[in-house]
Structure formats: structure tokens, C-alpha cells
């Protein structure tokens, strides 16, 4: 199962666009996406775990990090590879 964690902030001007892209791709590709605002205890804890210092930031399967607003096509391509078991570096 592919899982995306989107780190956002209420004051971030780019986060609404990132949320829209991630939500659309998650729905259309049938994967789980959660929004973690960094101004909450849970969001901050998770962000620190991944070394995230700016938002928006997207973590996929606790392995892949995309900073900024993700490109819809590239995100969709990565998700399809992960769903197909073609993880980069997998043995």
C-alpha cells in the first residue's frame, strides 16, 4: 500500500496547491494520503523524523521526499511504480 504524508502549514502560500495535487492523485490512484500540519504536535514530530525544515513537503512510503509543490505527472508516475512493486533500490 502506498502512503503519502503531506506536511503543511496554515501560513504557507504554496500548501493549498500541494494539497490539491496530492488529494487528486491519491483519489485517482487509490492510495492513502494524510495531511500533517507542522503546527501540531504530531505533524512537527513526524517532520523532525524526516528532517523536514520547510513546507510543503511530501513523504511517500517513509522513503521518498519531494519538497515544494509536487508535479502531478511525476507524482503519478512514482506512485504507479511503487504500486507495481518496482521500488527504486528494492532487491
Swiss-Prot record:
An MF annotation (GO) of this entry: protein-disulfide reductase activity
GO BP terms, alphabetized: cell redox homeostasis
InterPro entries registered for this protein in UniProt: GLR_AS, Thio_glut, Thioredoxin-like_fold, Thioredoxin-like_sf
Record bears the keyword Cell division: no
Domain of life: Archaea
Residue pairs linked by disulfide bridges in the UniProt entry: 12-15
Localization (cell): Cytoplasm
SUPFAM superfamilies reported for this sequence: Thioredoxin-like
Domain Glutaredoxin: from-to ranges: 1-91
Keyword set, alphabetical order: Cytoplasm, Disulfide bond, Electron transport, Redox-active center, Transport
GO cellular component: cytoplasm
Pfam families reported for this sequence: Thioredoxin_3
Coiled coil: none
Family of the protein in this entry: Belongs to the glutaredoxin family.
NCBIfam families xref list: redox_disulf_1 (TIGR00411)
Function, in words: Acts to maintain redox homeostasis; functions as a protein disulfide reductase.
Name of the protein in its database record: Probable Thioredoxin
Organism: Archaeoglobus fulgidus (strain ATCC 49558 / DSM 4304 / JCM 9628 / NBRC 100126 / VC-16)
Amino acid at each position: 500500500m502506498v502512503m503519502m504524508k503531506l506536511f503543511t502549514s496554515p501560513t504557507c502560500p504554496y500548501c493549498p496547491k500541494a494539497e490539491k495535487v496530492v488529494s487528486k492523485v491519491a483519489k485517482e490512484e487509490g492510495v492513502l494520503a494524510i495531511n500533517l500540519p507542522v503546527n501540531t504536535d504530531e505533524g512537527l514530530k513526524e517532520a523532525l523524523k524526516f528532517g523536514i525544515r520547510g513546507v510543503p513537503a511530501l513523504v511517500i512510503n517513509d522513503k521518498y521526499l519531494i519538497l515544494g509543490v509536487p508535479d502531478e505527472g511525476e507524482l503519478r508516475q512514482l506512485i504507479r511504480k511503487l504500486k507495481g512493486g518496482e521500488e527504486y533500490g528494492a532487491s
